[in-house]
Amino acid sequence: MKIFRQNIICWSICCLFFASCAYQAEPLFKEKRTLYYYNIENIAVLPFIDYTNTQGVSREVTEIFTEELARFNESGVVHATAMLNYLHTNKIVITEHNIREVGLQIGRVFNVDAVVIGAVTEYDPYFPPKLGLSIEVLTVSDSETIFTTSETYDASFNFVREEIKRFAGTKKVKDSVYGDELIMQKMDLYIEFVSYDIIRKNL
C-alpha cells in the first residue's frame, strides 16, 4: 500500500510537470522574465482601456489576459471579476488620465506587488484579424514602471501566422480541433493567442 501511494504521488507530480511544460511553445529562462526578475509574488490586472470604442472588448480582453497571466506565471493573480466588482462598488471609472493613480490605489487595497495597466489600441475581428495591446507593469511600493510594450498583431503578416501556428501546437488536445485557421476566425481565441505571446515573451 505504501509503495502504491508513493507511485500515485510521483505520477501526479509528473502529470503536473508535463502539463505546465506542454503549455509553453518553447523553453524560456524564467530569470529573464520581468515578474521573476523583480520578485513579483502577486499581481492585479486593471480593466483595459479600449481606444477602439468597441462594445464589450475591454472586459473580454481583461478577462482573457488575466486568465493567461494566471496560467503562465508562478505569481498570484487577482481574478478580473474581483477587480471589476471593486470598481463598480466604489463607483470608480478608469480613464487614461487616472489609470495609474487608480492602479496604485487598487494595488494597495488588494495588497499586491504590482499592477498591469493595459489598453486596446487596435481591434479588427474580420479575417485576417488584428489586435493591438499596450501593456505597462507598475510596482505598487514605489510606482516604478518595470515593463512596458505596445504591440500590434496583424494576422495578414506571415511572421504573425507562424506564431499562431506555434501557439496552436501548444493547445492541441486529442480529438479536438484547435488549429491556426480557427484561431484566426474566432476573436476570443485570437485575443488568447496575443495575450499568451506577450506574456510568454516578457512577463
Predicted regions and their residues:
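Bacterial N-terminal signal peptides that target proteins for export
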Residues: 1-10
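Bacterial N-terminal signal peptides
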Residues: 10-19
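N-terminal post-signal-peptidase region of extra-cytosolic proteins
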Residues: 29-31, 47, 97-103, 117-121
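Solvent-exposed loop/turn segments connecting transmembrane beta-strands
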Residues: 54-56, 122-129
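Soluble periplasmic/extracytoplasmic beta-strand elements of cell-envelope proteins
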Residues: 42-47, 115-119, 132-137
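N-terminal segment of the mature soluble domain
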Residues: 52-115, 197-198, 202
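Acidic/histidine-rich, surface-exposed loop or edge segments in extracytoplasmic proteins
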Residues: 40-51, 82, 86-88, 173-174
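C-terminal/domain-edge helix-coil "capping" segments
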Residues: 21-41, 109, 130, 140-203
